[in-house]
Regions:
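Conserved catalytic neighborhood of penicillin-recognizing serine enzymes
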Residues: 115-141, 195, 262-266, 272, ...
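Short, well-structured active-site flanking segments
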Residues: 96-106, 180-183, 242-245, 470, ...
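Soluble, non-transmembrane domains of envelope/secretory-pathway proteins that act on or interact
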Residues: 263-264, 336-350, 373-377, 384-387, ...
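Non-catalytic, structured segments within soluble enzyme domains
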Residues: 119-384, 547, 561-562, 566-568, ...
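Active-site beta-strand/loop architecture of penicillin-binding DD-peptidases
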Residues: 273-291, 444-479, 490-491, 595, ...
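Active-site-proximal helix/loop microenvironment
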Residues: 253-254, 263-268, 302-304, 562-628, ...
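Active-site SXXK
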Residues: 87-88, 235, 311, 376, ...
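N-terminal type II signal-anchor transmembrane helix
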Residues: 1-56, 94, 114, 322
Length: 838
């Protein structure tokens, strides 16, 4: 019997042993099979997570940020222990002792889930396993993935420290609110750095690890608090905090940004605008979208915050003034359902959800509001973010909207969403009433930059970025009209003309495939023989066309492309009047080269870009400072900047043209609206039917330009470059010169100054004086004799006829570099559009 029993148990033992051996061999085979072609865990040592790219102003303040995944990388040594412990207690309490997998943890998690009936659930995967899943494997719920995860976890634990593993985990994990990693989550939920988090706040972040979408701190408040409290209890059990601290933190309410207890980080930044969005557009093109949105770039913008604000307000004021003068009421086009108006919480919630502009501060902040009632003499409104008080009743008196056309009761209805702002007293700022506003249909752009460095100081691409993201400074290509004429005059001055050269202002007829083209001056008058200076000051079209014919449109085309106004300009005469399309960005950049004496300068919105490691990968400024390293320069001496920029225009030509453009401001088409206390030059531009109006002007330091027009071109009633854009330039520059100053334009050594009669172009004596006298710069050898210097392409006599056809002769002239050139009837007549006017 004993022998039988021994034999029976021996057989069982043998079978068990064989079973264990077979299981071991099977497991070994499985692990060998799945462990052959696993991803290399060594890539984790070169972990470069997707991180936020941030834009800073010159003062080092963050003004915008861009991210595919909003992540702020923090090394393990800078992550507070309380944060690490919170996640360990929530996700992997044996993290610091297990070899990558945790049998006890799996069993304990299952027991807790059963005991709590599913209310207390912690992950069965270790933190190491989660790292493997997130970095090297897919998220498939398959046995194969779990086996690979286990194998990789064991391997990684052998080569990486626990701190290295938890660094990967805490920087990669998604925690809701577009927050990746604990640092971004701490900012999103509490607007705090990690070092300032309380145990309860750290516990809430850890609670989000498994179900970030189901534990919103407002919408799922009770669930969020329950899960936070579970983590706090675990932290006490694991010995990371005391029972007293755990109890105190569990009793505290959950306060977050989302519940309104803390200001959001985004609220500390200015609203996104045209400037930073253009940086996004340009750098995404230059660096690639992946690097821009995920590379953790540090971008130093050129923007001057005060001037940017002034650019916004100056342009907005001009656009609103024109819109209100038209009297058309359009509103926002948004409405709120009538049933929501009965309850304040309902209409406030509905109003907050609407996509209406909230970035306008013209005359004070503009608020979205809903019309709650249309009464006989007023609109009763509800204003977003503002509680009604006896001192500030939320009504708009009917008298406030007398500027509108149409019937009061037809213009408004209950539920209409409108924009309003406070009207306040100029003397003491006290509240007067709420006043109705609207985003204009007419649009425009403004841009200002440093003439020497190309640094764009301000850029406004429309009335409101939130209303329309189209940047009309860089993306809207429109006809510049007469704002292009300086490039025709530059070509002429470099071809032997002088500011005193006489050109005939007389009718011209040109036979084209589309018919006979008869260009005219804006005044529909002809002025006969006229000096070049007067031609540009008064924006004479016929003189410009004659110049373009004489110099040759191929030469004008070359100048326009050299200055960057166009990439490929058609060599047609109508283009000399600004008939081809360009952008404000290009035109302002081109004018800067007049102002700086003819050196190439490229507009830039960015001073420098640094990568995630702090290495500079782009710097705009290429000039070098010769003596900046000297501790102290002699009194009155400034550092010497060695310019290595290309010269694209003769310095004398640049000065002559600048002087002539000063005349535009002093007595020409901009004289009524531009009047600064420093020397100023510029040119107006107005196209046919006033569909586009421009003004581009400059001082010795800053060049700025304005464009106004409808996105779908149509006439601006009574519009002109001087009348519409001149005031925008004036308001902006009044502010700019306070900071940047201004002085006389630099005079080249080659200039010989001679008194000229600006009406006749004749040379005057050195002692001549009067309104007709202007001191003109001439190159050596080009000084006129006493009398009048005529354009050699036209026969001039006492009985000069107003010719209607161009001469058929050519002539030799001396250009600015001393060489000779042949000019004459070189124009090529192609398809002609209407072109510019004045």
């Amino acid at each position: 019997m004993l022998r039988f029993i021994m034999s029976f148990f021996g057989a069982i033992f043998t079978m068990a042993t064989l079973g264990i051996i077979m299981c071991a061999l099977g497991l070994g085979a499985v692990f060998t099979f799945y462990g052959r072609d696993l991803p290399s865990y060594q890539t984790l040592s070169q972990y470069t997570p997707k991180t936020i790219s941030r834009v800073y102003n010159g003062e080092g303040r963050i003004i915008d940020e861009f991210a595919a995944e909003r992540r702020l990388f923090v090394p393990a040594e800078e992550i507070p222990d309380i944060v690490k412990y919170a996640f360990v207690s929530a996700e992997d309490q044996n993290f610091y002792t297990h070899p990558g997998y945790d049998i006890r943890g799996i069993v304990a998690a299952a027991v807790e889930a059963v005991q709590s009936r599913g209310s207390d659930i912690r992950g069965a995967s270790t933190i190491t396993q989660q790292v493997m899943k997130n970095f090297l494997l897919s998220s498939d719920r398959t046995a194969e993935r779990k086996i690979k995860e286990l194998i990789l976890s064991v391997r990684i634990e052998r080569v990486m420290s626990k701190d290295q593993i938890i660094e990967l985990y805490l920087n990669e994990i998604f925690l809701g609110q577009n927050s990746y990693g604990v640092a971004a989550a701490a900012q999103s939920y509490f607007n705090k750095p990690l070092s300032d988090l309380t145990p309860g706040e750290a516990a809430y972040l850890a609670a989000l690890a498994q179900r970030p979408g189901n534990l919103h701190p407002v919408r799922q408040y009770d669930d969020a608090v329950d899960r936070r409290n579970y983590v706090l209890r675990r932290m006490a059990i694991d010995g990371y905090i005391s029972q007293e601290v755990s109890q105190s933190e569990r009793e505290a309410p959950l306060r977050t940004v989302q519940s309104g207890d803390y200001d959001s980080f985004r609220s500390t930044l200015p609203p996104r605008g045209y400037f930073t969005d253009e940086i996004r557009r340009q750098l995404s093109r230059n660096f690639g979208e992946d690097e821009f949105f995920s590379g953790g770039l540090s971008i130093r913008a050129t923007v001057d915050p005060e001037l940017q604000t002034e650019a916004e307000l100056s342009l907005q004021q001009a656009l609103e003034e024109y819109d209100r003068a038209r009297g058309d009421w359009r509103g926002t086009g948004r409405t709120i359902a009538a049933e929501a108006l009965a309850n304040e919480a309902d209409w406030r919630s509905a109003l907050a959800s609407l996509d209406v502009p909230r970035d306008v501060a013209l005359g004070g902040r503009w608020y979205p509001a809903v019309v709650r009632a249309v009464e006989e003499n007023q609109l009763v409104i509800g204003v977003e973010d503002v509680q009604e008080t006896e001192a500030e009743p939320q009504v708009v008196p009917r008298d406030d909207i007398q500027w509108m056309s149409g019937d009061f009761f037809e213009n408004f209805a209950e539920g209409d969403v409108v924009l309003v702002r406070r009207m306040t007293s100029d003397s003491d700022g006290s509240f007067i009433r709420w006043t109705l506003r609207q985003v204009p249909q007419v649009e425009g752009a403004f841009m200002a930059m440093d003439v020497d460095t190309g640094r764009v100081l301000a850029m406004q691409g429309g009335f409101s970025y939130q209303s329309s993201e189209l940047n009309r400074a860089t993306q809207a290509e429109r006809q510049p009209g007469s704002a292009f004429k300086p490039f025709v005059y530059a070509a002429a001055l470099d071809s032997g003309y002088t500011p005193a050269t006489i050109v005939v202002d007389a009718p011209i007829e040109i036979d084209t495939p589309q018919g006979l083209w008869r260009p005219q001056n804006a005044s529909n008058q002809y002025y006969g023989p006229t000096p070049l200076r007067t031609g540009i000051e008064q924006s004479r079209n016929l003189m410009t066309i004659r110049l373009a014919q004489e110099v040759g449109m191929d030469t004008v085309k070359e100048y326009a492309e050299r200055f960057g106004v166009y990439d490929n300009m058609g060599p047609y005469l109508s283009a000399s009047l600004g008939a081809e399309e360009t952008t404000l960005y290009k035109l302002v950049g081109a004018y800067a080269m007049f102002a700086n004496g003819g050196e190439r300068v490229e507009p830039t919105l960015v001073d420098r870009v640094q990568d995630r490691y702090g290495d500079t990968v782009y710097r705009h400024e290429s000039r070098t400072c010769v003596d900046c390293s000297i501790p102290q320069l002699p009194a009155g001496e400034a550092p010497q900047i060695d310019s290595n920029r290309d010269r694209i225009m003769n310095a004398v030509t640049a000065y002559q043209l600048t002087s002539m453009l000063q005349g535009v401001v002093q007595r020409g088409t901009a004289s009524r609206t531009v009047n600064l206390p420093v020397p100023t030059a510029g040119k107006t531009g107005t196209t046919n039917d006033s569909k586009d109006v421009w003004f581009v002007g400059f001082t010795s330091n800053i060049v700025a330009g304005c464009y106004i027009g409808y996105d779908t071109p149509r006439s601006l009633i009574g519009g002109s470059g001087g009348g519409f854009c001149g005031p925008v330039f004036q308001r902006f520059m009044e502010k700019a010169i306070v900071t940047y100053g201004g002085g006389p334009f630099e005079v080249p050594d080659e200039c010989n100054f001679i008194n000229i009669d600006r009406f006749t172009g004749g040379r005057l004596s050195d002692g001549a004086s009067g309104d007709n006298v202007v001191r003109e710069c001439f190159r050596g050898g080009e000084e006129p004799l006493f009398g009048i210097q005529f354009d050699g392409g036209f026969a001039m006599s006492a009985d000069l006829p107003l010719v209607d056809e161009v001469p058929q002769t050519t002539r030799q002239v001396r250009s600015s570099d001393g060489s000779t050139a042949t000019v004459g009837p070189n124009a090529s007549f192609g398809t002609l559009s209407s072109g510019g006017l004045y």
